[in-house]
């Protein structure tokens, strides 16, 4: 290896290390703002897949009770009293290809769990889809900060 090629390798390594983590990652890890802008979900690796937990609500206090929002649409009485902030939304979300996962997602708006797929659509874009029967609906989440 000549001195010049050694220098080039060192420069390339320095540039790779200097690339911001946000650009390097391109994965699902991070905090995501839902399409409606009413919640933020922290997505992180867990087990062999990914987990998603609600970390912020636009309206964290229920105006009817003056208390933190709870999972009151859940048909299971034991679960209907749990707070929305801290609620785990993903179940069994496992890799399903490059930048894709499939499993189940919980929708606190209706208290139901749906078959789901999640795909990284860009460094700051996550496509989240839920299906019941043959009907699917989805939304785009945007990477954000706490």
Residues covered by each model-derived region:
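Bacterial N-terminal signal peptides that target proteins for export
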Residues: 1-10
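Bacterial N-terminal signal peptides
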Residues: 9-18
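Sec/Tat signal peptide C-region and signal peptidase I cleavage site
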Residues: 19-25
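K/E-rich alpha-helical interaction surfaces of small helical-bundle regulatory domains
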Residues: 26-40, 139-146
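Central antiparallel beta-sheet cores of small beta-barrel/beta-sandwich binding domains
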Residues: 29, 35-109, 113-116
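Structural motif
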Residues: 46, 121-122
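Residue-level recognition of beta-strand termini and adjacent short loop/turns
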Residues: 97, 122-124
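Short, exposed beta-strand-loop hairpins at the edges of beta-sheets
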Residues: 108-110, 115-118, 125-139
């Amino acid at each position: 290896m000549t001195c010049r090629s050694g220098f080039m390798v060192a420069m390339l390594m320095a540039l790779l290390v200097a690339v911001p983590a946000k650009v390097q990652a391109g994965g699902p890890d991070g905090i995501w703002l839902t399409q409606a802008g009413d919640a933020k979900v922290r997505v992180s690796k867990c087990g062999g897949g990914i987990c998603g937990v609600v970390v912020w609500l636009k309206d964290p206090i229920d105006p009817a009770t003056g208390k933190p929002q709870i999972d009151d649409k859940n048909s299971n009485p034991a679960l209907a009293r749990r707070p929305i902030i801290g609620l785990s939304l993903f179940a069994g979300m496992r890799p399903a290809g490059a930048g894709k996962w499939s499993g189940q997602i919980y929708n606190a708006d209706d208290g139901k769990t749906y078959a789901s797929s999640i795909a990284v659509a860009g460094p700051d874009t996550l496509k989240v889809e839920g299906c019941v029967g043959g009907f699917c609906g989805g939304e785009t989440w945007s990477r954000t900060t706490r």
